[in-house]
Amino acid sequence: MDALVAHCSARLLQQEKEIKFLTAEVDRLKNYSCSEASADLEKLREENLKLKYRLNILRKSLQAERNKPTKTMININSCLEEVFGCAIKAAYPVLENPPLIVTPSQQPKFGDYQCNSAMGICQMLKTKEQKVNPREIAENIVKHLPDNEYIEKVEIAGPGFINIHLRKGFVSQQLTNLLVNGVKIPSIGENKKVIVDFSSPNIAKEMHVGHLRSTIIGESMCRLFEFAGYNVLRLNHVGDWGTQFGMLIAHLQDKFPDYLTVSPPIGDLQAFYKESKKRFDTEEEFKKRAYQCVVLLQSKNPDIIKAWKLICDVSRQEFNKIYEALDISLIERGESFYQDRMHDIVKEFEDRGFVQVDDGRKIVFVPGCSVPLTIVKSDGGYTYDTSDLAAIKQRLFEEKADMIIYVVDNGQSLHFQTVFGAAQMIGWYDPAVTRVSHAGFGVVLGEDKKKFKTRSGETVRLIDLLEEGLKRSMDKLKEKERDKVLTTEELKAAQTSVAYGCIKYADLSHNRLNDYIFSFDKMLDDRGNTAAYLLYAFTRIRSIARLANIDEEMLRKAAHETEIILDHEKEWKLGRCILRFPEVLQKILDDLLLHTLCDYIYELATTFTEFYDSCYCVEKDRQSGEVLKVNMWRMLLCEAVAAVMAKGFDILGIKPVQRM
């Protein structure tokens, strides 16, 4: 129906332009015979009236559809944009693509939302030599506002800002819908496929702190896309191919000659890698054998393939320990997966005339990129460039992805810019149709603001970092004497929740584009914008109903029967904050910056604290502690906050606990 309204509106606009033109023609021909022009004009006017009538019916029908109870939360900002978009179109039908700016107000005195389009429209009209001030434009927009269920009143402030006040009944109804139906947003990703490429460690090397960001950010993005209804393919593009496997396999043959029949106890793969690397750098004979093993691997020699699989399996077991601890879900599809596609990729670029030869290398220059891609080395081998081109083509043509997101550090931005440019140049995708993005991120720094290292100067192993987090988390809980009030199981759950939650949140709450300083002390602080504070706030909210002897069934019944009153300013502020959740998520789907969600959850928690300190949810006898009165509509507000926080935590990959 939206499309039909848009189509009618466009036709109406075109007709109004034609009427203007013909009216001018009639005026010009006043002194001459103009019966033909007049006849055309009358015909257009008649059709125009019919269209206006039809459009009015369609708009009313669309509004009636919208007024039906919905099972999902609505994006209020988008709804207001639609309303003001209609008003601007009606007020200024001749303007093409006028600015449409609706945002939440920063201060209560400016209403709940603001429309700041008048200033931009004023600039557009000035270019058409029309003298008008922004305030007059704002008044004209307000005059053309269609009937809607959202707006109580509007006020024009300053030079032309339109302050929007929402209807309390509308906000109350939306909160009731949330409580009755759960925290859901419209399925905007229905029938769309997203591929997220993240984590991607190298086989035979341990995961280190550098892999933490890609793993955490990528997982959270996947959860958000899934919540928005997308079909998500989570890919782990591991480094499981290349010359390093030659030296690893040659070393395996020497150290465990019976590896084909007896499973070799490799144990510490990192040490195994270092041993083979040392031999590769110092023993010429070993180096030759290593290169022979690479050739045999590429030709799929069965014995060499078995050795390769053994090494990959040992690595995979270590990776999976970390993925399991952090609740990360991935499908492994490493560089080896794309090996058989490399030859065809090179041929396709050659056939299209994009390949140049430079010192025996086959290179591809991409417009706007300073460094070419090397798709074949001088020794005839393929490169990361070749495998990344093979990967992007497979994802576009075989997986039929509508969107591909690469969660890889900022250092790779030029590489991905060139790969994406090459894929567009050869015609694999159109960026106007398919979104292919590099979601880059900064490095993890120590408290000295240098790259995060151990005291001996080595890269911090991720498994060690997680174990240290668990230790510090338990110390913090014992410091607060939680071990005296929680059962052993509850204490263990709280320890894991705080440790991993704090590590994830510390990363996600920073703008991913920037470097961030890793500090256990800061992330475990239960004050400020930290997971520790938010997890404590969540358990506190969850405990309010429990301590008032209100069970889930009573809350469910109340959600259907109790009107949510929003008369107190703190109730109103909290209600509006809860309902901003869908617009926050929409922004992140657009820019992939997850710290916005962290900021929102923190704002929701602090807004709840203001509400709880000002509004009694449960009134008790001060002497006996007996519950005298329960303000059920406020209990429902508590429940709505907890529900939204729980979904926010879930998207961030954080597991809250009921007791802490």
From Swiss-Prot:
L-arginine binds at residues 200-202, 211, 384, 388, 412. Pfam families: Arg_tRNA_synt_N, DALR_1, tRNA-synt_1d. One of its GO terms (molecular function) is ATP binding. InterPro entries: aa-tRNA-synth_I_CS, Arg-tRNA-ligase, Arg-tRNA-synth_N, Arg-tRNA-synth_N_sf, ArgRS_core, DALR_anticod-bd, Rossmann-like_a/b/a_fold, tRNAsynth_Ia_anticodon-bd. GO terms for biological process: arginyl-tRNA aminoacylation. The keyword Aminoacyl-tRNA synthetase applies. Residues 1-72 are annotated as: Could be involved in the assembly of the multisynthetase complex. GO terms for cellular component: aminoacyl-tRNA synthetase multienzyme complex; cytosol. Residues 529-543 are annotated as: Interaction with tRNA. Signal peptide: none annotated. Gene3D superfamilies: Arginyl tRNA synthetase N-terminal domain, HUPs, Isoleucyl-tRNA Synthetase, Domain 1. Belongs to the class-I aminoacyl-tRNA synthetase family. Interacts (via N-terminus) with AIMP1 (via N-terminus); this stimulates its catalytic activity. Interacts (via N-terminus) with LARS2 (via C-terminus). Monomer. Part of a multisubunit complex that groups tRNA ligases for Arg (RARS1), Asp (DARS1), Gln (QARS1), Ile (IARS1), Leu (LARS1), Lys (KARS1), Met (MARS1) the bifunctional ligase for Glu and Pro (EPRS1) and the auxiliary subunits AIMP1/p43, AIMP2/p38 and EEF1E1/p18. Interacts with QARS1. Part of a complex composed of RARS1, QARS1 and AIMP1. The alpha-helical N-terminus (residues 1-72) mediates interaction with AIMP1 and thereby contributes to the assembly of the multisynthetase complex. Forms part of a macromolecular complex that catalyzes the attachment of specific amino acids to cognate tRNAs during protein synthesis. Modulates the secretion of AIMP1 and may be involved in generation of the inflammatory cytokine EMAP2 from AIMP1. This is Arginine--tRNA ligase, cytoplasmic. The lineage of its organism: Eukaryota, Metazoa, Chordata, Craniata, Vertebrata.
